[in-house]
Amino acid sequence: MWSQRKRIYSKKMKNCFKFSCSADWQLHRILSFEGGFLGAYAVASRAGIFASAQTGNLMSAMECLYKGEGEALLFRIGFAVVFSGALVLSYILKVYAGKDLKSYCMFIDAAALFIMSLLPETLNPIVAVYPLAFAASFQWGTFSGSDGYNSSTIFITNNLKQCVWGFTEYIHSGNGAAREKGVYYGITLILFLAGACLGYVSVGLAGIKGGLIGLIPLGAAGYILKR
């Protein structure tokens, strides 16, 4: 009886983690970690500016418009243009040029970290995160999920929602597919937050230069991509 239950449990767990060995999912894991690192690095090193999304930036732009802060408004608009430009570029390269963008993404992320580590602390923080805004946006256009799941690697709101929905549905109905969904998004959340933690630690230890630590997970992703 015990052996039979053990076999059933092992089979369920194997099905639950059946995506864990795919190269796409491994890359997704690493880039989720990197996405958390990039976000935290920008926040910790540049006055709390989150480079990986536009909701806060555009809301702040409306505040600048209301207050008549013209220069700050231009910086915010520039931030949005840089972010949007990376999305346009990733779309053109993917759809019209037929390029596999993964290796391009690694290079752009690495270049952004190098540039950010060289920019002076006195530079306007919004302008200073432009390189990371471009890199994060390009990463979003490149790594948008794996194994049939749509999942961002640069921010986690939708990942949190899908994780909660997946486990809620599983608890309610016992649907194995819902459990797999919850596990997938749950692991993505954990890795993103682990990367964010490393980002804060890196800045705490090395200041702006701490961003170079983010090259380590990029190297791991490059290894998986080339093997």
Label the predicted regions.
Residues 2-227:
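Alpha-helical transmembrane segments of multi-pass membrane proteins
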